[in-house]
Amino acid sequence: MIFYEIFQVSFYQNFLWEKSVRLLFKVQRRLFKVSYIHDKKNLYELQKLIFQSNCARLLAIREVTQLSFNKKISGVDGKTTLNFLERFELNEYLRKNWNNWKPQSLRKRCVFDLNENLISDTISTISDRSWQVLIKFALEPVHEAFFHPFNFGFRYNVPIYKVQQAILLNLSNISFGSKKRILKVELNCNFSIFNYDYLMKKLIAPRNIKLGIFRLLELGFNLHFPENECQISTFSSLLLNVMLNGVENVHNCVRYGYYMLFFLRPMDNEKILANQILSLLYTRGIKKNSSKFLLVSNTKGFDFLGWHFKFSEKVKNGISAIPSLNNYQFFLNRVKRIVNNSNYGSVVKASKLYPVIKNWREYHKYSDLRSLSYSLFFVKKHAFSAFNSESKQDFYSSKRLLFKSFLVSESFNTVSKKYNFHILNCFSFGHLTFLSESINFFNKINLYFCVHCGMKCI
């Protein structure tokens, strides 16, 4: 039993972020258990306990003002930062008005996405964003218990490599992947028009919280997933996952954000499956013209999340994953833009190349990079000639800079050479797990928990 006194942390004592994270996770773990067994009475009590806790409110304010990527973007009030006293004033304001929240108007702005398309986005104020994070703390463990296991998009307990692992497992020789077809579904990124009533019915929260979310949506709050491929769980992505949950029950599939892959056997009809998907999306208020369908064969190959999957008899399991052509060209353009820039010196170029190359190789660490083009031999050669052309550098200093910029551990690409499926060795396989991830000033804290056996991993 968790008592209310554990959250009465005095402002005048030493307040530790690590302790507050563990206290919040303790209640979230209890909330995850209660929601799994459909105990609604204790569920609402634990949600109110999170809303009324000082730890959760201060962590929400800290995430918005210090840890968020959009912390320097202002809303309609023009505020980008808060001083020490303003944060405690915001904490008191959240304590008094969390159950009757009236959001302020949203500031609209136009930004470019990864495909260089101009899209409109809405920005809330700091107080509204803090309230959204506080609500996310209470809603996320409840809905994590009901999300489909093949929903891998923007959830803390599922890394992006599990998407690749699930696709390789479904298309391997063990699963007769050579006889399967793939139906790729891409949803529209703009969810400005959808069925509000359906979302309100699916949300598991007190009525006053639903009313605050409904007011926020009426102001024009856009529901969207983050553009990058990182696992960033936001309030908007949580609401979208709640609304799209259940599409995975139609057929054997993998969903990541807007993208879905349905694995069709030889006897499956793709037209019937497409009509079922469209009917489910229509009940959620999504237009039929906003989704794209593409039917491909496993032998011809297809692209998904920057990877190219193709059936190959040379591989032991029959399926190989390599970087897609668009992903590889985008990576090469970033490298060439740095190397060919005459405004940078060789030392600056090496420092800018290292994170780009490291992120690309880490993203494709379970892909087959044994090809000559993916070994980056010619990229190294071009970078070495650019370093050596500078008058301040000689052959040996250019070699050291090249080694510094392309320094990647040899542990990468060890699993991809054998294509062994280690999903059975994962401690969370067969267990319903909940993960709370917290980033403090020094390190990253991951708190795992299994609802069946109580297994923990810190």
UniProtKB/Swiss-Prot annotation:
InterPro entries: GrpII_Intron_Splice-Mob/Def (IPR051083), RVT_N (IPR025960)
Location in or out of the cell: Plastid, Chloroplast
Keyword Plastid: yes
A Pfam family assignment: RVT_N
Cellular component aspect of the GO annotation: chloroplast
Alphabetic keyword roster: Chloroplast, mRNA processing, Plastid
Main localization category: plastid
One GO BP annotation of this record: mRNA processing
Disulphide connectivity of cysteines: none
Domain of life the protein comes from: Eukaryota
Functional summary from the UniProt entry: Could be required for group III intron excision.
Family listed: To group II intron maturases.
Protein name: Maturase-like protein 1
Provenance organism: Euglena gracilis
Underlying gene: mat1
